[in-house]
């Protein structure tokens, strides 16, 4: 006997999201609204987002893009040096036993410029392409998952990538060079009562009376690299704006120095070298 099923209508991604929003409560609508406003506009949908919506579209990832010979050589040369360093210095079983990445390993990665892989060359970084960055993180992950997460979180959701995309020239000149000399960054979004839902976060940033700085108040958790970072990205609510006659929540990203008065790391979670 042949089993049959009735497929759901093949809604587009935006139509499906709007349909979900129309049936949700106020909090759900706010969360979806914030997510949609932050969504990047691409010529084609991403494979991952389509898969999430139940649409398998392999043509979005095949054939895989090829590197130019020049870019591939840059990656090959770096990976050769990196592989030698990892083989000689990184012991994932030691990371498992001690629950920390040895300082000597971190110092060695700093010398290799591993914390400035995508930082533009004009600011002291290596200026690698996204493809070479992906290749490098893949190599590190094959040795130790925790070390790969350290490097990836630092550069993708930590300060370097948001700074590269949205930072002012003054900010770039101030912060980018630090990542070539050992600064480690982290990302703080998740909160105890609301998880990773930015629409419901309670952390607030209020402009000081003299208008020179913001004052942040709140609690964050699950901040990858948070216990060893000296600079982090903190997501916080700022004063709402009136848009088309309606008040809209505002969420801003702040670059925060960890030695700022009032910042406290309460607890560090253990990790393993395996992903």
Positions of PLM-derived features:
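A structural signal for short hydrophobic beta-strand segments in well-ordered beta-sheet cores
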Residues: 203-206
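Internal helix-loop-helix
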Residues: 111-182, 225-231
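A short, Trp-centered hydrophobic/proline-enriched beta-strand micro-motif
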Residues: 181-189
